Curated annotation (Swiss-Prot):
Coiled-coil ranges per UniProt: none
GO terms, molecular function: anthranilate phosphoribosyltransferase activity; magnesium ion binding
List of residues binding Mg(2+) 1: S91, E224
Record-given protein name: Anthranilate phosphoribosyltransferase
Binding site for 5-phospho-alpha-D-ribose 1-diphosphate: 79, 82-83, 87, 89-92, 107-115, 119
Subunit structure comment from the entry: Homodimer.
Family designation: Belongs to the anthranilate phosphoribosyltransferase family.
Reactions performed catalytically: N-(5-phospho-beta-D-ribosyl)anthranilate + diphosphate = 5-phospho-alpha-D-ribose 1-diphosphate + anthranilate
SUPFAM superfamilies: Nucleoside phosphorylase/phosphoribosyltransferase catalytic domain, Nucleoside phosphorylase/phosphoribosyltransferase N-terminal domain
E.C. code: 2.4.2.18
Lineage of producing organism: Bacteria, Pseudomonadati, Pseudomonadota, Gammaproteobacteria, Aeromonadales
HAMAP family per UniProt: TrpD (MF_00211)
């Protein structure tokens, strides 16, 4: 580890292999907290490269609990959190809606980082069991087209870094790792980042990790596609990255103020999500979901352009069938537990 630190102290970047080695030691609990603080701080001050981020992600994936990966195409929609704007749970709600649109979604999530209610906080309130086994999660993915993978269940080793992260009180490499370490390893992905300068490096990281199709976005202050302004996009396709801007008009949607998608406490966010899923969402809420699900439909080849994709999402929202899917997921997520108790 000290060899890696000396490289960083000289202002040089680590190789992917070196970073993989360093973070493998971290998640196995082999690194002294003071040394770990030095590692994270040195990386932060130098600026983490895509190779370093990819190496760290590979280390965490190598140490993760196994998930029985399916051989069909499936996706994830996830944000880094940390944008500080406390909006409604767009990515979690979008994951459910994407499944109702016929996609397969394995959503990797955790408790709140930035908003008052992270994806796991919301699922808890909806009665969806967070700590189901990998086999049961796979069953949900097969039968319902959606499963949620609770990060601490798959990445237990990350707990070794938690005291240092909390003591440092600043963003570190760990803040961008969550969306990159889905243990199911989705075949395509929409990932939101908390800062515009991360869009390109994170796209390069996903490409280095072998993602074939994906999109990294930052939406005018949000870690998701914005309905209140332009969204910076880095699109991954056929081994290349293309950068462009998207506006609500590109989806055939109106522009709304960011205040129109403000979230609240977990109970309040659950009520907002329930309304959206039941077809009672506000126009702004529906637009936010449509904008974030539409690219997934396009990546999956289920729509010809973003406007027709967004229109399809709005139709699915209006039908209320996503609420039925969420209820079935809540039931199925608990079946294994009741079976074992019997």
């Amino acid at each position: 580890m000290h060899h890696h630190l000396n490289t960083l102290y000289q202002g040089q970047s680590l190789s992917r292999e070196s970073t993989r080695d360093a973070f493998g030691q971290v998640v196995r609990g082999e690194v002294d907290p003071i040394v770990l603080a030095s590692l994270l701080t040195a990386l932060k001050i130098k600026g983490e490269t895509p190779e370093e981020i990819a190496g760290a992600a590979e280390a965490l994936l190598a140490e993760a609990r196994d998930f029985p990966r399916p051989d069909y195409e499936f996706c994830d929609i996830v944000g880094t959190g940390g944008d500080g704007l406390n909006t409604i749970n767009v990515s979690t709600t979008s994951a459910l809606v994407a499944a109702a649109c016929g996609l397969k979604v394995a959503k990797h999530g955790n408790r709140s980082v930035s908003s008052k209610s992270g994806s796991s906080d919301l699922l808890d309130k909806m009665g969806i069991k967070l700590d189901m086994s990998p086999a049961q999660a796979r069953r949900c993915l097969d039968e319902l087209g959606i499963c949620f993978l609770f990060a601490p269940q798959y990445h237990a080793g990350v707990r070794h870094a938690m005291p240092v992260r909390q003591a440092l009180k600043t963003r570190t490499l760990f803040n961008v790792l969550g969306p990159l370490i889905n243990p199911a390893r989705p075949t395509y992905q929409l990932m939101g980042v908390y800062a515009p300068e991360l869009v390109r490096p994170i796209a390069e990281t996903l490409l280095a990790l072998g993602l074939k199709t994906g999109m990294v976005v930052h939406g005018a202050g949000l870690d998701e596609i914005a309905i209140h302004g332009p969204t910076q996009v880095a699109q991954i396709r056929d081994g290349e990255i293309r950068e462009f801007l998207l506006t609500p008009a590109d989806f055939g949607l109106e522009t709304y103020p960011v205040s129109a998608i403000q979230g609240g406490e977990p109970e309040e966010n659950r009520a907002i999500t329930a309304a959206i899923l039941e077809g009672r969402g506000t126009p702004a809420h529906n637009a936010a979901i449509a904008a974030n699900v539409a690219p997934l439909l396009l990546m999956a080849g289920k729509a010809k352009d973003l406007k027709s994709a967004a229109a399809e999402v709005l139709a699915v929202l209006a039908s209320g069938k996503t609420a039925e899917l969420a209820a079935r997921l809540a039931t199925l997520s608990h079946q294994e537990a009741s079976h074992q108790e019997a």
